[in-house]
Amino acid sequence: MQQLNPAEISNLIKQRIQDLDAGATAKNEGTIVKVSDGIVQIHGLEDAMYGEMIEFEGEVYGMALNLERDSVGAVVLGDFLKLQEGQKAYCTGRILEVPVGPELLGRVVDALGNPIDGKGPINAKMTDKVEKIAPGVIDRQSVDQPVMTGYKSVDTMIPIGRGQRELIIGDRQTGKTAMAIDAIIAQKSSGIKCVYVAIGQKRSTIANVVRKLEQTGALEYTTVVVASASEPAALQYIAPYSGCTMGEYFRDRGEDALIVFDDLSKQAVAYRQISLLLRRPPGREAYPGDVFYLHSRLLERASRVNAAYVEKFTNGEVVGKTGSLTALPIIETQAGDVSAFVPTNVISITDGQIFLESSLFNSGIRPAVNAGISVSRVGGAAQTKIIKKLSGGIRTALAQYRELAAFAQFASDLDDVTREQLDHGERVTELMKQKQYQPMSISEQAAVIYASNEGFLADVPVEKIGSFEEAYLRYMHDEQADLMKEIDDTANYNDDIAGRLKSSLETFKQNHSY
């Protein structure tokens, strides 16, 4: 009888185990127990993480938001009508990610980064997490470089710096989106990459915005992220974070980016809807208790990071460059009520706000910026030298004008100084008006503000200020192109530039009509 060698048997078993190819990968599995309004309750999935992607049958995905003792509450990122009770759900082990990189520039994508512009697939080489921790205090650098919006009223009185969060707030139909789109168009020569996130808007409105960006050549350096009004609340909630991740790609590699959230009021409403469906306890205005955190964790990701952070992030590939992500969140108020829950939250998170007023808009002052309560908390350090030097007179003139205009209604006889201040204020108000889609360069702004400060508009009738400005800038581009280029290139202000501006104004007023 043959003797069995235990060592041989042991080796044979070990060899068989090593050669075994386990075809099925182990997945944490659960069962759908309830489906309603885009929310799924799943029994099981003990290992699910907060924010993890959950896979359902039929290639539908969800995101885990409620981790309870014996079940998981998830929002469906897509068509929840395909799902039924009793179907299986699987953990993926992955937090939600979106494609990032320069391949997304010039494209229109949904909240998950899928192209929706009919221009074919996006062959992005990288993906990144939608939810990320904002850079720490040590990794940041103070804001000291400007983002020119092309608006005289903003760049002079409420300047924005790279890495700043500047809120645009106002009622519906006051020009909030127009201001943000103009800011994107104005970045044509600045090298700043842009991301426009449309949340809860009509598709026709978004199509108009995309068309305008295309016509002005701004789409080539812009990514448009869309979560329209017809899409599930879950996608409207995620879209701003997805857009932020796309913008952070450039920030972390030593480049500058600008992101517009249009608008965060609708994101808060979508999050409220999700929270109530998940049976979370409601608070003030039925918003959940963490609605402040919803916006703070998003807007804290907009920052200016120092060269050490960029060098470490790129493993030494990019040296000596700082990166920035500037945010322009938009909030819609109801009847000018800035003391409502979401507006006060976002005002306290951001580094300043541009307040647009219906009454100014309807009286023809556009952009309808209320200079009194609009403020930029950090932008002053980022202003260019020439604009900083010249803009002091603008804010003073407007403040005095608003104060005196109230008294002038009742007083019949005004002294000469008061009348002079009223006349000057009226002209400055007229000068601050600007047409849509016509952003102005540094040199153009400097030229017209200098004219106002030095009293060259005093004898120009108020109704002719607009035509004077147009004719004067045309003259400057034709006759003083070198001066305009020098101001644009250096942004410096000295006696030589002031003298040349003065003589060009004198020549223009003598020899040209307007």
Swiss-Prot record:
ATP binds at residues 170-177. Its EC number is 7.1.2.2. GO terms for molecular function: ADP binding; ATP binding; proton-transporting ATP synthase activity, rotational mechanism. Transmembrane segments: none annotated. Keywords: ATP synthesis, ATP-binding, Cell inner membrane, Cell membrane, CF(1), Hydrogen ion transport, Ion transport, Membrane, Nucleotide-binding, Translocase, Transport. The keyword S-adenosyl-L-methionine does not apply. It is found in: Cell inner membrane. SUPFAM superfamilies: C-terminal domain of alpha and beta subunits of F1 ATP synthase (SSF47917), N-terminal domain of alpha and beta subunits of F1 ATP synthase (SSF50615), P-loop containing nucleoside triphosphate hydrolases (SSF52540). GO terms for cellular component: plasma membrane; proton-transporting ATP synthase complex. It holds the Pfam family ATP-synt_ab_N. PROSITE patterns: ATPASE_ALPHA_BETA. The record marks 374 as: Required for activity. It is a peripheral membrane protein. It catalyses: ATP + H2O + 4 H(+)(in) = ADP + phosphate + 5 H(+)(out). F-type ATPases have 2 components, CF(1) - the catalytic core - and CF(0) - the membrane proton channel. CF(1) has five subunits: alpha(3), beta(3), gamma(1), delta(1), epsilon(1). CF(0) has three main subunits: a(1), b(2) and c(9-12). The alpha and beta chains form an alternating ring which encloses part of the gamma chain. CF(1) is attached to CF(0) by a central stalk formed by the gamma and epsilon chains, while a peripheral stalk is formed by the delta and b chains. Produces ATP from ADP in the presence of a proton gradient across the membrane. The alpha chain is a regulatory subunit. Belongs to the ATPase alpha/beta chains family. This is ATP synthase subunit alpha. The lineage of its organism: Bacteria, Pseudomonadati, Pseudomonadota, Gammaproteobacteria, Moraxellales. The gene is atpA.
